[in-house]
């Protein structure tokens, strides 16, 4: 999945 730049998937 694609995550917005600047946010970490955590």
Swiss-Prot record:
Stimulates the secretion of gonadotropins. Its main location: secreted. Transmembrane segments: none annotated. GO terms for cellular component: extracellular region. This is Gonadoliberin-1. GO terms for molecular function: hormone activity. Belongs to the GnRH family. The modification Pyrrolidone carboxylic acid is found at residue 1. It is found in: Secreted. The modification Glycine amide is found at residue 10. The keyword Secreted applies. It comes from the Eukaryota. It comes from Clupea pallasii (Pacific herring). The keyword Secreted applies. PROSITE patterns: GNRH. Pfam families: GnRH.
């Amino acid at each position: 999945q694609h995550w917005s730049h600047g946010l970490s998937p955590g």
